[in-house]
Amino acid sequence: MHEITLCQSAFEIIDSQAKLNNAQKVKSVWMEISALSCVEVSALEFCFDIVCRDTIAQGCQLHIEVIPAKAWCWDCHQVVTVSTFNAGCPACGSQNLRVENDDAMRIKQIEIE
């Protein structure tokens, strides 16, 4: 389960930003993860709750948006979006794709008080 490691890394960023802004509490966190990141959303939510225990982020709301990955189609020369590893190019049907951001995960926004 690599979700715990991802949550620990995300919490370090969240905690650092909260401290930089003299926050007393982290209320909400918005994250984006790639559809091809192999991250299980329910496991990420569970691990995030564990990592945030007894911290200024305890009890904060986690909002996760799963975003399609971007890929370059070598046959029709377009940037396309894909949501599964075996998806062909939605424009031409080719399997000749180079996925650009298959493992992306980012913190989009943090709400503090």
Swiss-Prot record:
Q: Which UniProt keywords apply?
A: Metal-binding, Nickel, Zinc
For this entry, list what GO says about its biological process. Answer: protein maturation; protein modification process
Q: Name one Pfam family in it.
A: HypA
Q: What does the entry list as the binding residues for Ni(2+)?
A: 2-3
MF annotations from Gene Ontology? nickel cation binding; zinc ion binding
Positions bound to Zn(2+) = 73, 76, 89, 92
What Gene3D superfamilies does its record include?
3.30.2320.80
Q: Which InterPro entries match?
A: HybF (IPR039002), Hydgase_Ni_incorp_HypA/HybF_CS (IPR020538), HypA/HybF (IPR000688)
**Summary of the function given for this chain in its UniProt record:** Involved in the maturation of [NiFe] hydrogenases. Required for nickel insertion into the metal center of the hydrogenase.
Question: What's this protein's family per the entry?
Answer: Belongs to the HypA/HybF family. HybF subfamily.
Task: Tell me the protein's name.
Answer: Hydrogenase maturation factor HybF
What species was this sequence derived from?
Proteus vulgaris
